[in-house]
Amino acid sequence: MEVNSKPGILKRIAGPVVTAVDLDAHMYDVVKVGNEELMGEVIKIDGADTVIQVYESTTGIRPGEPVINTGLSLAVELGPGLLTSIYDGIQRPLEVLIQKMGNFIARGVTAPGLDHEKKWTFKPVVHVGDNVVPGQIVGEVQETRSIVHKIMVPPLAKGGKVTKINAGDFTVDEIVIELDSGESFPMMQKWPVRVPRPYVEKHSPSIPLLTGQRILDGLFPIAKGGTAAIPGPFGSGKTVTQQQLAKWSDAEIVVYIGCGERGNEMTEVLTEFPELQDPKTGNSLMERTILIANTSNMPVAAREASVYTGITLAEYFRDMGYDVALMADSTSRWAEAMREICSRLEEMPGEEGYPAYLSSRLSEFYERAGLVEPLAGGSGSVSVIGAVSPAGGDFSEPVTQNTLRIVKVFWALDANLSRRRHFPAINWLQSYSLYMAQLNDYYDEKVSPDWNKLRSWFMEVLQKEAELQEIVQLVGSDALPETEQITIEVARMMRELFLQQNGFDPVDTYCDLPKQLDMFKMIRTYADLAYAAQAAGVPPSQILAVKAKNEMPQVKFTKDYKPVLDKIYAGMEAEFKALRA
C-alpha cells in the first residue's frame, strides 16, 4: 500500500544512511529507496530532509533516484508457519529467497514472512454467539508435531460477539472468524516490531529456566521470564553456550538471533538442530525453533531490525501462553551498528563512540522480557539471554556495563579457563544470579530441601580454594594445613566433576536436576568422610589416595548412573573405614 503518490528524491548517500528531500513521511515509516526499491526505514526528519537507514547495500545508487513511502511501520507477519523458519533481520524467509534467486541474493528482492499459499487446518475453540475480547484465543492449528499454534484476536481489535467461525483448511489470508462489530480476522496478524505487545500484568518470576548445564542450573540459575548476559572475549565459548541453551533449555519455543556474528555459526545451528531430539517431546529441536540469521557481512542497519524482529516473534508466542527463550548473539554487534549509524548521522558520540542513547536502547530490548499474564489469560514468559563480545575481554567497556545494569544474571566467560580447556568457561567467582532468593522455594519443593545448603557449601569451598591458590602456587599444597589440603582436593573435584561439562558427549551434554543433586551429594559425602578421617589422625596423603573417587567421573558419562553411584558410595565407606581402623 503506497500512500504517497509523489516520491521523494535522493539527495545524499553515506553508506547505509541516505537522505531524501520532499518525502511526506512519518518516523519509522518503511520506504523503498532508489530504482531497485531497497527497503529502508525513516529514522530522522529535519525540515524537508528525511534521513533513512537502508536494510540492504546501497552500492550503486545515486542522488536523483526516487524514494517511495509505503506509509507502513516495519512490521512482522505473525501466524502459522513461523516455526522451523530461517529469516533475515527483516523477516524475509531465506529459503524462499534462495528458491527465487539462488545462493547469491540480489538487492531489492523481497518475500512475505509467511507462506500465503499453504493451507493449515484450523480448529475453532469458540462458538457462534460467544463474546470474544482482544488477545483471546479463538482457534488452534497443529503447526509442528510438538507445538499447537493458537490463533488470537489481534490485540488492538474491538472484540464482540462471534457471528461466524469456520473450521477446516485455510491459508493465512482467508477469513476464519467474523464478529458483530463488523470485524473479521484471518489466521495471520501484523505487528510493528518497535512496539511491545500488550499484556494484562507482569509478575515476578519464580520458576527456573532449566538448561541442563550444571554450573547454570546449580549455581547461577535464570528464571523463566528473566534476563541474562554472557560476556566474554573471543574464543571463550559464548556461541557454544548460547547453542547449548537453545538446544536444552526447557522453554517451549526458542528464538535464536545470530546478530552480526559469523555465518559458520548459523550453519552449525542449521545442520545440528534438525538432528537433535527435544528431551521433553522426542521430536526434532528445529520444530520449536525460529532462526534469524543476520551475519557479520550483512548490512549493519538490519542488525538492529533483527533484534526487534526476534523479540516481537517471542512476544507473540508468549501471548499464546508459551515459555519462550530468546538468544541474541551478539548484542555488541548490534551496538556497533548503532555506533556506525550514529556517526553517519553526525550525532554527538558518547563513551567510546557509542551513541548517548545506548543504555536506553538496550533497556528497551531487555525490558520486553518477563513473566506476564497475557490478554488471553494464564501465563507466558520471554527469557532473554544476550551474548556480549567486549573487545579484548574488557568488561568495563560501555556495552557490557550498560547490559549489567539491566540484566539480573551474569555468566562471565573467562579466557583463562578456556585456555585450560575448562568448559563451559564460566568464572564461578565473577558470575552471579539475582534470582536465587526467588527460586529457593522451587528448589526446596521440587528437588530437595538440601539443595540450597549444598549450593552455599559448594560456593564457600570454591571461594576458599581461590584464597588458598596463591599460597599453593608459591610453596605447593604440601605446605598447607591438613584440613586445607583436603579443601583443595574437594574444590578440584567440584571443578572437574561438576563444573566442567562436555557439550559434545551424548550423555554429559544435558544433566537434569536429580542427577545434579546426586553429584552434589557424592562430592559432599567424600568431603565429610575425608574431614572425619583427618580429624581421626589419618594423614592427608592416604585420604587423597582413596581409589573410589577415581570412579566418580563415570557418573557424568553414564546414562543409568545409579549403580555406578552405589558402587562409589560402597567403595568410599569401605576404604575410609579401613583407614580409620
UniProtKB/Swiss-Prot annotation:
Q: What catalytic activity does the UniProt entry give for this protein?
A: ATP + H2O + 4 H(+)(in) = ADP + phosphate + 5 H(+)(out)
SUPFAM superfamilies on file: C-terminal domain of alpha and beta subunits of F1 ATP synthase, N-terminal domain of alpha and beta subunits of F1 ATP synthase, P-loop containing nucleoside triphosphate hydrolases
- Superkingdom field: Archaea
Tell me the compartments it is located in.
Cell membrane
Detail which positions bind ATP.
232-239
Q: Name one GO cellular component term.
A: plasma membrane
Q: Which UniProt keywords apply?
A: ATP synthesis, ATP-binding, Cell membrane, Hydrogen ion transport, Ion transport, Membrane, Nucleotide-binding, Translocase, Transport
> Which CDD domains did the record assign?
ATP-synt_V_A-type_alpha_C (cd18111), V_A-ATPase_A (cd01134)
Q: Which Pfam families match?
A: ATP-synt_ab, ATP-synt_ab_N, ATP-synt_ab_Xtn, ATP-synt_VA_C
Give the signal sequence positions.
none
Q: What is its EC number?
A: 7.1.2.2
> From the Swiss-Prot or TrEMBL record, what is one GO molecular function term?
proton-transporting ATPase activity, rotational mechanism
Q: How does it sit in the membrane?
A: Peripheral membrane protein
Gene Ontology biological-process annotations? proton motive force-driven plasma membrane ATP synthesis
Matching InterPro entries, A to Z?
ATP-synt_VA_C (IPR055190), ATP-synth_a_Xtn (IPR031686), ATP_synth_asu-like_sf (IPR023366), ATPase_a/bsu_AS (IPR020003), ATPase_F1/V1/A1_a/bsu_N (IPR004100), ATPase_F1/V1/A1_a/bsu_N_sf (IPR036121), ATPase_F1/V1/A1_a/bsu_nucl-bd (IPR000194), ATPase_F1/V1_b/a_C (IPR024034)
Complex and partners: Has multiple subunits with at least A(3), B(3), C, D, E, F, H, I and proteolipid K(x).
Q: Which PANTHER family match?
A: H(+)-TRANSPORTING TWO-SECTOR ATPASE (PTHR43607:SF1), V-TYPE PROTON ATPASE CATALYTIC SUBUNIT A (PTHR43607)
Family according to the record: Belongs to the ATPase alpha/beta chains family.
Instruction: Report the protein's function.
Output: Component of the A-type ATP synthase that produces ATP from ADP in the presence of a proton gradient across the membrane. The A chain is the catalytic subunit.
Instruction: List the protein's name.
Output: A-type ATP synthase subunit A
| The gene coding this protein | atpA
